[in-house]
Amino acid sequence: SVGFKAGVKDYRLTYYTPEYETLATDILAAFRVTPQPGVPPEEAGAAVAAESSTGTWTTVWTDGLTSLDRYKGRCYHIEPVAGEENQYIAYVAYPLDLFEEGSVTNMFTSIVGNVFGFKALRALRLEDLRIPPAYSKTFQGPPHGIQVERDKLNKYGRPLLGCTIKPKLGLSAKNYGRAVYECLRGGLDFTKDDENVNSQPFMRWRDRFLFCTEAIYKAQAETGEIKGHYLNATAGTSEEMIKRAVCARELGVPIVMHDYLTGGFTANTSLAHYCRDNGLLLHIHRAMHAVIDRQRNHGIHFRVLAKALRMSGGDHIHSGTVVGKLEGERDVTLGFVDLLRDDFIEKDRSRGIYFTQDWVSMPGVLPVASGGIHVWHMPALTEIFGDDSVLQFG
């Protein structure tokens, strides 16, 4: 019969297309899908493709007013996960037109906005994204990148050294600045505000900025090296964040810092643009990442959050330490460290890289090894991360 038929249809009739040849402009996603008992994997994979693109739970007459073939996400391949019962990797291709240019926020809202609460799925994890050059070229990316940072700092052929000022909460601004001076004078390249140092009653941000700047200039004068302190510009509103970055620029310091997940991608991208326009380096902390990436079978893998940060913009990002953890984790960590630093990364499933990623000429991000590391870890850290990294102690 011709005409419109309402009713609930299986997603796989429309959204599971194993014969589909992916386009060079498609955004590709690899999801780890755990279907509910009785739900076939093809239906679960198609449901993800539908709900994160053009589909809804039923057919509506307005579907006829657009071209689904042009705009729908497609689940084009499904494979079982070795060694896991009832787990599959579903590959989904999204047409480029579904996404706003230069917006990580919109990309995530589309791809992971709704599907994770889906009834047909017991659990869902976004393992990897392939960002085509046609899309990544709409982003500024890191404010400066690895090479420009080395030129600004005049430090080459070695990892950069930093430490976080402790106790992280409770010091007055003056004593905080004193600790910054001692660390920088003693030979570190950078000191760091802790991620939860914003502007608390015992130390308001402007006081901290002034005393830290004094410490930087004093240490620079005495050592003849360029020094920096990651001044945390993260704030309760985007306007306040930019205000703090403006103050840092006026004080003439080299680098500011942002918590990109708690602060949000929109704020982070604004800050990255400001930093490039004004010659500030941008250090990114990943506070809250484990809420999103820790579960093996649900959430978003950190390599996706790392790719998103490279697009949104940051010159440093915390990326784990590898030291003392499992060997397998080492390969996976090195996988996303390469995704942060290199121009072109080959698909390599043993390192968790599901797609070949071509960043073309987008600047790289320095990985920051941070969290529970001390001097005895140095040989392992330099072997794992090589020269292009920041070793952040404390």
Curated annotation (Swiss-Prot):
Q: Where does substrate bind?
A: N114, T164, K168, R286, H318, S370
- A molecular function (GO) term: magnesium ion binding
Instruction: Identify residues that carry N6,N6,N6-trimethyllysine.
Output: K5
Keyword Transport appears in the UniProt entry:
no
Modification type N6-carboxylysine: residues: K192
Keywords annotated in UniProt: Calvin cycle, Carbon dioxide fixation, Chloroplast, Lyase, Magnesium, Metal-binding, Methylation, Monooxygenase, Oxidoreductase, Photorespiration, Photosynthesis, Plastid
Q: Could you say which EC number(s) this protein's record lists?
A: 4.1.1.39
User: Which transformation does this protein catalyse, written as a reaction?
Assistant: 2 (2R)-3-phosphoglycerate + 2 H(+) = D-ribulose 1,5-bisphosphate + CO2 + H2O; D-ribulose 1,5-bisphosphate + O2 = 2-phosphoglycolate + (2R)-3-phosphoglycerate + 2 H(+)
Q: Locate the site labelled Transition state stabilizer.
A: K325
* Origin superkingdom: Eukaryota
This protein's GO CC annotations: chloroplast
Q: Is Metal-binding given among the entry's keywords?
A: yes
Under the heading InterPro entries, the entry gives: RuBisCO, RuBisCo_large_chain_AS, RuBisCO_lsu_C, RuBisCO_lsu_C_sf, RuBisCO_lsu_fd_N, RuBisCO_lsu_N_sf
Residues given in the record as Mg(2+) binding sites: K192, D194, E195
Q: Which cofactor does it need?
A: Mg(2+)
- Subcellular location as annotated: Plastid, Chloroplast
Instruction: Kindly give any further remark recorded in the entry.
Output: The basic functional RuBisCO is composed of a large chain homodimer in a 'head-to-tail' conformation. In form I RuBisCO this homodimer is arranged in a barrel-like tetramer with the small subunits forming a tetrameric 'cap' on each end of the 'barrel'.
Alphabetical list of PANTHER family matching this protein: RIBULOSE BISPHOSPHATE CARBOXYLASE, RIBULOSE BISPHOSPHATE CARBOXYLASE LARGE CHAIN
Q: What does this protein do?
A: RuBisCO catalyzes two reactions: the carboxylation of D-ribulose 1,5-bisphosphate, the primary event in carbon dioxide fixation, as well as the oxidative fragmentation of the pentose substrate in the photorespiration process. Both reactions occur simultaneously and in competition at the same active site.
Q: Which family does it belong to?
A: Belongs to the RuBisCO large chain family. Type I subfamily.
Q: How does it assemble?
A: Heterohexadecamer of 8 large chains and 8 small chains.
Full protein name = Ribulose bisphosphate carboxylase large chain
Annotated source species: Euryale ferox (Gorgon plant)
